[in-house]
Amino acid sequence: MAQGKISGRVYDSKSGQPIEYATIAVLKVQDSALVTGTVSESNGSFEVTAPYGKYLVRVSFMGYKPYVHPETVTLGERHATVKLGKIQISPSAVMMEEVQVRAERTMVEYQLDKRVVNVDKNLVSSGGTATDVLETVPSVSVDNDGTVTLRGSSSVKVLINGRPYEMMGNDLETLLEQIPASSVESVEVITNPSAKYDPEGMSGIINIKLKEKTSGALGLNGVANLNIGGPLPFMVPDPLPKIIPTAMGSISLNYTTEKYNLFFSADGGQRSRGSQGHSNIERLRHGSAWSHDTIDQYSIRGNYMGSMKVGGEYYFDSKNSLLLSYQLRGGKRHRTSNIFSHDLLTDGILDYTQLDTNDNANVNHVFNLSYIKKFDEKDRELTADATFSMRHVKGNGWQEQSFRDTLINGIYNPMWDRYYLRQTESENHHKALNIKVNYVHPFAETWKLETGYEGRMDWPDQNAVYFRTEYDDLTHTLFRYHDTISSTHFNYTQQTHGLYATVGGKFNDHLSAQAGLRVEYSYLLGYDVNHPATDSVRKSYWEPYPTLHLSYEINKSNSMQLSYSRRVRRPHMWDLNPYLDVREGQEMSFGNPNLDPEFTNAFEFSYNLSLDKWNIYTCAYYRQTNNMMTRYGYVWDSVSHQRYSWWMPYSSQYDGYWASTWQNLDKGYNFGLELIVDWQVLKWWKINASINLYRSTIEGTALLDNKSQSATQASGKFTSFMTLPNDWTIQFSGQYFAPWLDLQTTMFPAYWCDLAVKKDVLQKRGTINLRIGDIFATGGWGHETYTEQLNRVVRSRRISPTITIGFSYKINNGLKQKPQNEEEEDSGSENVY
């Protein structure tokens, strides 16, 4: 039977804003019997097919008067497509101006292959950055060094709006500190991704979704934010400055018409953090201590950031759209550390002070082009996305030490006093291109095929030059020279090309499945520009990555999921580059050009129970890793160098330093249990709590003298939301990390609590918020390392509590609707399915 199409757009008659989920019913002229129907999309548009004939078109939406198109719609060979244009519907008489829909999303939404954590209403991260947002996400943690972990593993792929974070800015720590929390809408946690996603990351993917649009309304819409704060001055220890300020502001605007959407956003400010640390380091030779260091460190890190994004999306018709955007992101990071050391040697006492200063400035350009093609068949879609970025980072570092040998063999000699300066000049360039094409083809009513290509090409260039200034014992003068051992100019090229396909759908009302396969080719070439023949690495390989997801819905309240995926963790440029990075406390690190990727087989079984006031999610997961990558440390000397660092030139000037690098082990195993609970205690009070418990085992290798090593780790998070009268909201959250064991290191427990209060003002167009971070000043990290060559205990804490005060204002604050749970007059809504 020949069919035609009826299309149009639904708008609110007063505000002019599009209405999503309005019911469009196609009725017979003779008896008004329902023939077919649909619902409107987010931009108000709809399209419905019907057999040739004459029809009435009725539009209805809860809280609005029903609308019947005044003209009979006739579909036939001469008029196979009828465009109704703009349809305006009016609010019902009982709909009052001040009443709004409060369709609050739950904090955690569960989908077939991911969890979506809605953080746009999170108060404890308000006034902060994306780092603060991630700290509130169940199963995710961020330590003092900015390392992001998922279920205790740092092997996690971090994306920004579905693109690798390297496309968006500098290193991950800096980038997260440069993204305001107010710009983050949600965080997707994908612990066992399908073949559609990049297989990089042993423990999964964290996708930070930024707010692209402020509203779906026509006309000009936007939101502005301003936050200021810092730690309490009387909690800041000397010699740090008493005022460590934080100030951040942002504005986001978009202008929408029926044919296009223009958007602009800008943010900037300063984020400063202070920390205090204490270390005890004992170095051993032949089982006996030959030095004992006591080190106190006081640091302050300042991030000065700014970004601007401008772009537009053009709608050719209801099926085709093109988006073009440009983003400029820049910033400057400054870090100063004051270090005081007291070193007990076997032949004397050495005191020294050290001042470390590091500055770097970065500029990043990101260009994005996206195309979306929707077909007549529902859910059939073609998308293409290309992103190109250019980054330039220029840095300078100074490490200044003043030594004083107070006693040598029991006698003080001022001639042994020393001065030492290490200066770094670095300049890094990074170009990257990411291309993704995805096609979705539905078939057999409930099934769909999804296939595509994803390619990523990286061209980083790292250039770091080191200079030293030392005291000459003979001339008693200072001399400066170029440190060729530590200097590096490393050029790197990496390409990854992948083809993937997934097939998924429903067997019946209870059982759903999705199977996929991704095949990738990876190629990398890295070399030192000054020594290309000797200091180089070249690798290439083909690898398959199969995935499988099964879901069984017992009833509306109970469901189960089983999944499998093969994952990979590839070495990064800095993991492979064998240049020496010498740091305070006689420590240094370097890359391993012989490092190979690790591969993981990941299994998960989850159960979700959804009741009236409860949602309980439980998950058991198991990961088996081959060729496991791990960081390994030892005391640098000629004997250890031959065993662990055959690719590094030996230098006696670093004898006694603690050296760390990357090594491949044999196998690793992880088994864990995860529990996430959402509880609506009262109408105005809800709680979210999560617990993660897992055990890891490292299979015996030569590094472990062919012995296995196991450790157990646990962590938990708790969040309480209270919505009080007169538009007050209070949020309290706490986190706890139990002690855990790594290959050579035991981490100490860590815990802290945050408190936030919000008040809506100016008829809910404005919001005032107050946040107190780490209210009990317990936040900090620590670890201890015990080997045959080194005993080390390190503790550090951030300067807290911190207080942040912020204000947010919404421009043209969206569509006002009647709550669905209130009584209303008959709107004529009907179920068209």
Give short role names for the model-derived ranges.
Residues 2, 65, 75, 81, ...:
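Membrane-proximal, glycine/serine-rich, low-complexity loop/turn segments characteristic
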Residues 422, 448-555, 702-703, 707:
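Signature of Gram-negative outer-membrane beta-barrel scaffolds
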Residues 29-45:
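Short, acidic Ser/Thr/Gly-rich low-complexity loop/linker segments typical of extracellular
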